[in-house]
A protein has these predicted regions:
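N-terminal "arm"/small-domain region of PLP-dependent enzymes with the aminotransferase-like
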Residues: 1-52, 142-143
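PLP-dependent aminotransferase class I/II
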Residues: 35-36, 57, 204-282, 286-289
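Conserved PLP-binding catalytic core of the aspartate aminotransferase-like
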Residues: 269-270, 283-317, 339, 371-372, ...
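Short loop-beta-helix segment that forms the pyridoxal 5′-phosphate
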Residues: 54, 66-88
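PLP-dependent aminotransferase-like
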Residues: 91-149
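Active-site phosphate-binding strand-loop segment of PLP-dependent enzymes
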Residues: 126-187
């Protein structure tokens, strides 16, 4: 199986003798502001609750999410991270085929494979990677399938308007459409793009979201889905009990009620993604894609350099980027970087400029820096 995540910092540092406290992790697209103070406070105040079993139905959190998304509690399922839900959906609904528009989040393919469902991959050959593209009509040839889409798409960052998603769902009534909106909270005008409020009203739409990326606590694992009541009931028959622990529920409830933090995050990311993108455009030999969210996909145009080699050289400067060569539809000429703090973003720009300005092939200069097999460890 492929790993669909970056951010394996501790594992890499433990195995190869690097200091995790000195690593700047651009491989995982987590909120640069970190975890909200209200979450830290709530967890500290309610820590003693771990002596009791958690609420297996996550009732308080489901109610809060239902209010936030203008639906009923019966339309919501809470998961131990969005990944639990990605694996649950095909296992419970058992489509005849899975369909993926590549490149996209690697866990989708693994989720289908885990349920022994054959996957049809449609490679997006448009250079700008639009989600709704000329290959979409090919879905008509696949009966009773399930389609996983990511909006904004990971790793390309492409954002698709709500009306285009709704049209796709209505045009494919016999195909379950699953939309991963893990990064939608970072979008300032998300009402133009999100279909989460439409999900309870449609028979073939499921929307999945993560709480850990936006609120900066991926170690806790917390996500949720919204769909119509009939679909939720089918999914719940296959969902394992007790998967969401007490601390995660406390953190999630505190987080989604912190509207000031959410507004500050969107403003901060908006400024910093522009700063990082503008800086990347000045570096020769690379082409950054216009960002919509808190990460940027970069195309390497210098044929002497590869993403694996650049990654290895940057690790010498304690900078970890996401090598995108293991995404279907991408190759060794792509990497992804998260938007972080101004100081960290500037350090990345300086280091990357130095790498790209070096007239020596990076493939040659990487020798004796980091063992070649390290690149495989950090491709998640």
């Amino acid at each position: 199986m492929l790993s669909g995540h970056g951010g394996n910092v501790k594992q890499i540092c433990d195995k190869y003798g690097l200091n995790p406290d000195e690593i700047i992790d651009f491989s995982a697209s987590i909120n640069p502001l970190g975890c909200p103070d209200v979450v830290r406070k709530a967890v500290a105040e309610q820590f003693n609750d771990i002596q009791h079993y958690p609420d297996s139905q996550c009732n308080d959190l489901r109610k809060a999410i239902a209010e936030r998304t203008s639906c009923n509690e019966s339309n919501v399922i809470i998961g131990n991270g969005s990944n639990e839900l990605f694996y649950l959906i095909p296992r419970a609904l058992q489509p005849k085929k899975g369909v993926l528009l590549q490149p996209t989040f690697a866990e989708f393919s693994d989720a289908f494979s885990n349920s022994n469902i054959d996957v049809i991959e449609i490679i997006n050959d448009d250079k700008d990677f639009p989600l709704i593209n000329t290959n979409i009509p090919r879905l008509k040839s696949v009966e009773e399938c399930m389609v996983f889409l990511c909006n904004p798409n990971n790793p390309t960052g492409q954002l698709t308007r709500k009306e285009d998603i709704i049209e796709l769902v209505k045009d494919n009534p016999n195909r379950m459409i699953v939309i991963d909106e893990a990064f939608m909270d970072f979008i300032e005008d998300d009402e133009k793009y999100s279909v989460i409020k439409e999900a309870p009203l449609m028979d073939n739409l499921i929307v999945v979201r993560s709480l850990t990326k936006f609120y900066g606590f991926p170690g806790l694992r917390l996500g949720y889905l919204v769909s119509n009541e009939s679909t939720v009931n089918k999914l719940m028959r296959y969902k394992e009990p007790w998967t969401v622990n007490t601390i995660a529920q406390v953190a999630g409830l505190a987080a989604i009620n912190d509207k000031e933090f959410a507004a500050n995050t969107r403003q901060y990311v908006s400024v910093e993604k522009t700063f990082l993108y503008d800086g990347l455009t000045t570096i020769k030999g690379i082409h950054p894609f216009q960002p919509t969210v808190n990460f940027i996909l970069v195309k390497i145009e210098d044929r002497k350099k590869t993403s694996s080699a650049i990654q290895d050289v940057l690790m010498k400067n304690n900078i970890l980027i996401r090598n995108c060569s293991n995404f279907k539809g991408l190759d060794e000429t792509y990497f992804r970087v998260a938007v972080k703090t101004r100081k960290q973003n500037q350090k990345l720009l300086d280091a990357l400029k130095s790498v790209m300005d070096d007239v020596t092939s990076v493939e040659d200069s990487q020798k004796n820096i980091v063992p070649e097999f390290v690149a495989e460890e950090i491709q998640g």
